[in-house]
Design a protein with these regions (language model features):
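Conserved, mostly hydrophobic/aromatic
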Residues: 6, 35, 76, 131, ...
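Conserved strand-turn element in the central/C-terminal portion of the radical SAM core barrel
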Residues: 80-84, 155-179, 198-213, 234-244
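Anion (oxyanion) recognition and catalysis
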Residues: 99-100, 160, 281
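Catalytic cores of alpha/beta
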Residues: 113-123, 174-189, 243-255
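Auxiliary Fe-S-binding modules of radical SAM enzymes
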Residues: 189-294
């Protein structure tokens, strides 16, 4: 019944639409924060190598390649709690070039920025800002202690004030309870987000969560259906950890998924754009950018 009603809700608001987005690992490693799931934290001994911010030309070429493949959104993602003003200027220049020359829509996940930063980025072509809440308010302190959920929610509020769409979601399998999953869905509804990425933890060696068991497929299905009921007008985006559920990911369309991060993730492998397009078409889906439902 949960599956059937979730499918009906998705069809009612989104028909058979499926949206594809991709991410660019704009700056990697040596993050000052201690999120227990993340291999980029300087607190943990992982194999991630630090990198400097990519150039405007590098960002543009990535966006251009994905635009040609039929991807609808391109997000620049950077490690660290925030970027320098010079780094933000480089990213703004990239957004300006991408938005003026390509069809692909610009997104960003650049940390805890301030209002003036968001205004500047929006004027440069940024459409949507991403900042994951990760988990419930109650469980958040078990995952990260170097910043708070309130800081994340304040950042989201500033991005909305600047006129940006919001993308915010969670990670399943970090040790949270079913109640925590309900709470994070309710928290996201309160924030009125436009898109919710649902990640499945991919335990990475060297992080505190390296020995966490993989989430059972039935838990993933039930959680997605739950989110669809709580967030009927929000795009539910299958995100990190996709290879863990590769064998049954198209089944998740029936539970409420109507978007996917395609290609490689930040520090783990993903599925190719061609794979995702083929899967969507074989399931009678229509590949298209989905605009926010107000």
């Amino acid at each position: 019944e949960l599956k059937e009603s979730a499918s009906k809700i998705t069809s009612h608001f989104f028909k058979e639409a499926i949206e594809l987005c991709c991410i660019s690992n704009g700056k990697c490693g040596k993050c000052s924060e201690n999120c227990k799931f993340c291999s980029q934290s300087r607190y943990y001994n992982t194999e991630i190598q630090q990198s400097v911010l990519k150039s405007v030309d590098e960002f543009f070429k990535e966006a251009q390649a994905n635009d040609k493949r039929g991807v609808h959104r391109f997000s620049i993602v950077t490690a660290g709690v925030r970027l320098s003003k010079a780094e933000l200027k480089t990213i703004a220049q990239a957004y300006k070039k991408i938005s003026s020359e390509l069809k692909i829509s610009c997104c960003g996940s650049l940390g805890l920025l301030d209002y003036d930063d968001f205004v500047m980025l929006k004027e440069s072509g940024l459409k949507r800002y991403h900042n994951n809440l990760e988990t419930s308010p109650n469980f958040f302190k078990e995952i990260c202690t170097t910043h708070t959920m309130k800081q994340k929610e304040d950042t989201i509020a500033l991005a909305k004030k600047a006129g940006l769409e919001i993308c915010s979601g969670c990670i399943l399998g970090m040790g949270e309870s079913v109640e925590d999953r309900v709470d994070i869905a309710l928290e996201l509804r309160k924030l009125q987000v436009d898109s919710t990425p649902i990640n499945i933890l991919n335990p990475i060696k060297g992080t505190p969560l390296e020995n966490r068991p993989t989430v059972h497929p039935d838990e993933v299905r039930r959680t997605i259906a739950l989110f669809r009921h709580v967030l009927p007008k929000t795009v539910l985006r299958l995100a990190g950890g996709r290879l863990i559920i590769q064998k049954y990911f198209t089944d998740l369309y029936k539970y409420g998924i109507n978007a996917e991060i395609t290609g490689d993730m930040l520090t783990t492998a993903g599925l190719t754009v061609a794979d995702d397009i083929s899967a969507a078409i074989s399931n009678q889906k229509i590949l298209t950018k989905i605009e926010p439902i107000k």
